Amino acid sequence: MTEFELKLEIPAHRLEPLLAALKKGDTQRQRLRATYFDTHDGALAGKGIVVRMRKEGRKWVQTAKAPGKGPLARLEHDAAVGADTAGTMPAVELMRHGGTPVGDAIRRALGLRSGAEFPPLVRLYETDVTRLSQTVRYGESEVEIALDEGRILAGTRTVPVRELELELKHGRPEDAVQLARQGCGIHGLWLSTISKSMKGQRLAGTAAAPVRGAQAAVYGRHAGGHALVTAVVAACLEPVLTRASEVAAGSSAADDIHQLRVGIRRLRTALRELASLTDGIDPAWEAPLVETFRALGQHRDHGHLARTVEPQIEAAGGPAVDTAALDADVPDPGSVVRAPAFQDCLMALLAFSCREPDQPGRGHDSTRKRVRKALAKLHGQVLQAGAGFASLDEVKQHQVRKRLKRLRYLTEFAAPLFDARKTQDFADSIRPLQDALGLYNDELMALHAYRALAPAHAKAWFAVGWFSARGAPHALACQHAVVVFSRIRPFWD
């Protein structure tokens, strides 16, 4: 079966109030102890597959989970093993999942043909949690709310567990999301795609599935407006949720922050350029997306100065400059991502991506026409302004770069509507211009940063002069790249 489940992290100071609120309803308490397994080389975890044996009360249940469509959907199969009569955990047997989608995923992950013998599994880590749960009716749906408190153990290492899970038992995913929004708003919770198994893998130091980048939106060539928009928004949300979960959990890794900003930019492009194709896109979503994007941008820029720009200046013969003074006003990335406004926006977008349209929306012909018009408008704006790039002020230069990025993302979103080869060729042709504009923008950012440092740090004047001298040639290089790009025939013509 396919499981739709939302997992919310609970800050320590909100645990008791949340427990008290949950106990007001008809709840069940259960201790759940589980052991997780994999092959000796981590082949299952490498494909995002989880196999566990869990004691639920006096019963043993073997469960396998595999990735589904989207970050919140999972393929799952439970196999009842029997009652706990001997007081010991039964042996884990992968064949118990045979003939199911999860079982097929396990065979693919292990490279086994049908009927081939499964390899032995090894014990990796354990979970020991107390679950307080209740099932509620919300909207047209039935949702199980489960609060898990406990710990994950791997050898002598442990990490605490404080999670609220909302699992859709019956009905519409958007109802489960709307219910989760209430919990987040009242108790300051935040969405997370980091499961107990992922936490256990990290604690045990074992292999885990690689983080997936942005995936192409999947919809039919003759899709109408609403189907296209929800598919695109869902595809944009997946990497945003994944990276936001890491940052909210404490990661300040440059790649996590960079990819989260890329994901937010893609999402904003979808909402801006495709809004006319369906109803339900709320203009209020833009503000928290922009605020988060800009706050994370400060962190990215200052990291780029330290990792890339400062070594570049020193290699050019300049003095070392301590840029730490610029870090004073940089917000904590985790706090930025856990902010209630951003979390509520993510929830609202999730609900939208799951929603059936109130009205049929634009038909295929109208959808294709409107997408073509949006592509042509962005393309024309880039070429017109970019032709004189070197003479533009900085604001208008930055606008050219932003419009080019929107053109690239919209090209990716629209790909199923047009010829695949022509679309890909056009997308590839954008890259040289985007790289030129990106380099120019990074050096302009560095120039302003060192200029701000210079009055108090005289050594920064070398960088100010160095980047100032590079500005005009790089602007002309961008202008030339626009001319080259203008020779590429649009795929929508």
Give residue spans per PLM region.
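Function-determining surface determinants
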Residues: 1-493
